[in-house]
Amino acid sequence: MSNNYETLYILRPDLGEEVVQQQVERYRTLITEHSATDIQVKVWGKKRLAYPIKKLNDGVYVQMNYQASGKQVAPMERAMRLSDEVIRYLTLKLDRVVAPPADLSPLTEIPPSPITEAVVEDDGISAED
C-alpha cells in the first residue's frame, strides 16, 4: 500500500549550488528507483538552524513530498545517514497530501492592537497588611 511521505533534510551550508543540485537529484533518483511516485521537491535555500548541529549554524533545507511504501523509504534514509553532506533528516508519514509551500517569505505581520488602560479600583487592602 502506498502512503504519503514528507522528507525534510538539511545539507551542509558550505556546499556550492551545483553540489546542492547534485544531492537533490541523487535522492530524487534514489527514491524513484524504489518505485516512489508523485515526487515534489522544494529547495528552501540556506537558513539559520534553530541550534548548532555538528558545529554548524546554517544549513540548506530541502523538502521532498512523495508517495511510497515504508520499505521504499528506508534505502533513502540509509543513504542520508551515511552521507557527509546531509547533517540532519526527518521523514514523516502524512495522513493526507500536503503541497510544499509556494513561497517561504516571512509571515505577514499583524499590527499590534491598541493598548487600553485598565482602571483598577482600590479595594482598601494594602500589600503591607
Curated annotation (Swiss-Prot):
PROSITE patterns: RIBOSOMAL_S6. InterPro entries: Ribosomal_bS6 (IPR000529), Ribosomal_bS6_CS (IPR020815), Ribosomal_bS6_sf (IPR035980), Ribosomal_S6_plastid/chlpt (IPR020814), Transl_elong_EF1B/ribsomal_bS6 (IPR014717). GO terms for cellular component: cytoplasm; ribonucleoprotein complex; ribosome. One of its GO terms (molecular function) is small ribosomal subunit rRNA binding. GO terms for biological process: translation. Keywords: Ribonucleoprotein, Ribosomal protein, RNA-binding, rRNA-binding. Gene3D superfamilies: 3.30.70.60. Binds together with bS18 to 16S ribosomal RNA. Belongs to the bacterial ribosomal protein bS6 family. HAMAP family: Ribosomal_bS6. This is Small ribosomal subunit protein bS6. The gene is rpsF.
